[in-house]
A protein has these predicted regions:
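CheY-like receiver
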Residues: 127-167
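Basic, Lys/Arg-enriched C-terminal extension of HTH/homeodomain DNA-binding domains
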Residues: 199-246
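Short alpha-helical "packing" element that flanks the helix-turn-helix/winged-helix DNA-binding module
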Residues: 167-174
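Charged, compositionally biased boundary regions
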Residues: 151-154, 174, 193
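DNA-binding alpha-helical recognition surfaces that contact promoter or target DNA
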Residues: 118, 172, 196, 203, ...
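Generic alpha-helical secondary-structure signal
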Residues: 49, 119, 186, 197, ...
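Recognition helix of helix-turn-helix DNA-binding domains
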Residues: 177-212
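N-terminal regulatory/sensing modules of transcriptional regulators
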Residues: 1-144
Length: 246
């Protein structure tokens, strides 16, 4: 059994699998030497456990974009928490979520144990050296502001790539809400050509066949409800077709 780097506090591990997610997405954690561990299924249980276990590491089953507001709450309340989101596949919007939250990392469920151990070491060291105030201030955005920030990061990153001219135009129109038929009319081309351009972009970014391009690169803006649990559910529903990735 491999242990974390000497000098770090004993590791407490939270395995979080929210209702609707597949626990088979968890990686093999047998190589981690932990002081204590627990499996949880509700956001309320996770937040309460982090209150009682400061400095714990979380491994969550599923893509982070489907639980965006939950992670915002986690990092706002417990800014030094390390979170690994484990899944069979990730979408471009998930990469943007990883880039926004300093201590959130994407891992594939088939990741070798030795790699997970090393990533845990580096992440835990980074968390204890980070200013909590910096992370707290970054996570005070409102729900619409947070969703727009993630979507903007995704769009800027994807459009900065060397895309074919037709692919760039198709991407822009689809993300603006145009249907494939309307996109074809605006570009003066056929629906099949639009479909082919979309498939090329999906292949470029490893987007599964069953996931529409707009759902892979954009989180839909949820209706904001003052109930703490309602926005989490709305963003989870608006992040698109997570079931296709399990």
């Amino acid at each position: 059994m491999q242990t974390l780097t000497r000098g770090l506090p004993p590791l407490r591990l939270i395995m979080f699998c929210q209702s609707g997610e597949n626990p088979a997405q968890f990686p093999d954690t047998g190589g981690l030497c932990v002081e204590d561990s627990v499996r949880l299924r509700t956001p309320e249980g996770l937040l309460d456990r982090l209150r009682r276990w400061p400095g714990a590491m979380v491994i969550s089953a599923g893509r982070p974009s489907t639980q965006l507001l939950l992670w915002q709450q986690v990092f706002q309340r417990y800014p030094r928490t390390v979170v690994f989101c484990s899944s069979n596949a990730f979408l471009p919007v998930d990469v943007s979520v990883e880039g926004y939250f300093r201590h959130l990392r994407l891992i594939k469920c088939a990741m070798p144990v030795r790699v997970l151990v090393r990533m845990a070491e580096l992440a835990m060291w980074s968390s204890v050296q980070t200013s909590p105030y910096e992370e707290e201030m970054k996570n005070v955005l409102s729900v619409p502001e947070l969703v727009m920030e993630i979507n903007s990061r995704t769009l800027v990153r994807l459009l900065s790539e060397r895309l074919p001219k037709q692919g760039r135009r198709v991407l822009g129109l689809l993300l603006s809400g145009c249907s494939p038929e309307m996109t074809a009319r605006m570009l003066g081309t056929g629906v099949r050509q639009v479909w082919l351009a979309e498939q090329t972009l999906k292949q470029r970014w490893d987007i599964p066949a069953g996931v529409p391009l707009p759902d892979a690169v954009r989180i839909r803006m949820p209706d904001v409800n003052p109930d703490i649990n309602q926005p989490i559910a709305l963003v989870k529903a608006g992040a698109g077709n997570a079931s296709d990735l399990r």
